[in-house]
């Protein structure tokens, strides 16, 4: 057209999202709210054992949701035992039915998968169960499970592919071991189980497996819960050991062999010490690997469009607006470099990104003071800095740690676990004793932590906590009466529920 300005290229979509997990779906639905043409590509590569699942990503299918439900199964077993002391006549032997539990959990997950499909359809988001790979600028190839390929174009792209469990790279690991991707839909009870790893996934799974009555051993290479407050991590480990979970420390598996096939079968694990030549062997019905997760970024054609990744970790560096080094490509969730790997973070980031792209918003995702909970038998809630990080950031002389054990009233009648629940706050003495770290070990830790997380966002100080009247008799009230500092070395042991 003579003299006319060149028209912009017409794309099939305004936004194509690779990954149908919590973050990707949140971004898709939010972008659709602003009448944008949105497509979601989601594809689950089966595990080495062949496990696959529906729309919704890791959290819904193979992490937070089934994990919390199975943790609840274990808590109910403890509640049944406690109930005898409260006058209930409960049979001496309590049996757990694995198949019944997994069927109920999988039925619930199935309803969630269906709900996500319906929500996308209602919001006019195009969904394809296909594997997305960049093939050129603004272009992506979608391959379905039958191998059929289609090419789509979009003005902008969002990578929200998440992570998958890492394997050891030893003989027998992919042939005979399971991961958390397999555990929650395992069609038979795992029996005597070895959990390899010290991640929160490892300890949570070990905890509920032991809680439903299984023989559980955890093999740990170095420390528990790397990245978390180590004082809290060690208390979790001690509590798990006291409740029958065995720990093999400073060993790593070097070979897994099948002794007998079956559901479950029998496996032999050969492991080597991390600091000597010592070799040990053990027999288990199931070996579950929980040694970490790897970002799903290496096989989606990023090199074709020039998106930079950290070659060692596969993580994607982004700006504070989740933009990659390629301006029209964004990324959110667990695949981001140096960001918190949590579902609600991905959801928040996805929503806010869509609002910035399509609604003129300037609000960015705040990755500071993100609360989290580890659902070990004794739950661990945290917000803000670990003690180690606080010392590193402010200097040991500029922090004050207030702490106390506490005994939930409900546990006094069965007379169990006194001086196991623990509360700790870390304060910056140079900033009006502002609370920079909040940590609690006890029942319902997530429920306790959530409200305090809002307070930390508002700049909570020790004085404000002290002037807050507690609710009696609940666990959270301990935070309104903390008076003993770690520095003082004074006793924090409790004689009763009211301190």
From Swiss-Prot:
Modification N6-succinyllysine occurs at: 68
Entry annotated with the keyword Phosphoprotein: yes
Cysteine pairings via disulfide bonds: 59-64
MF terms in GO: FAD binding; identical protein binding; NADPH peroxidase activity; thioredoxin-disulfide reductase (NADPH) activity
Cofactor dependency: FAD
Residues where Phosphotyrosine is found: 131
Positions contributing to NADP(+) binding: 166, 198-204, 221-222, 226-228, 292-293, 315, 341
Cell compartment(s), UniProt: Cytoplasm
Sorted UniProt keywords: Cytoplasm, Disulfide bond, FAD, Flavoprotein, NADP, Oxidoreductase, Phosphoprotein, Redox-active center, Selenocysteine, Ubl conjugation
Enzyme class, first EC level, given as a word: oxidoreductase
Catalytic reaction list: [thioredoxin]-dithiol + NADP(+) = [thioredoxin]-disulfide + NADPH + H(+); H2O2 + NADPH + H(+) = NADP(+) + 2 H2O
One GO location term (cellular component): mitochondrion
Cofactor note: Binds 1 FAD per subunit.
Misc: The thioredoxin reductase active site is a redox-active disulfide bond. The selenocysteine residue is also essential for catalytic activity.
Function: Reduces disulfideprotein thioredoxin (Trx) to its dithiol-containing form. Homodimeric flavoprotein involved in the regulation of cellular redox reactions, growth and differentiation. Contains a selenocysteine residue at the C-terminal active site that is essential for catalysis. Also has reductase activity on hydrogen peroxide (H2O2).
NCBIfam families xref list: TGR
Protein name as it appears in the record: Thioredoxin reductase 1, cytoplasmic
Source organism of this protein record: Sus scrofa
Lineage start: Eukaryota, Metazoa, Chordata, Craniata, Vertebrata
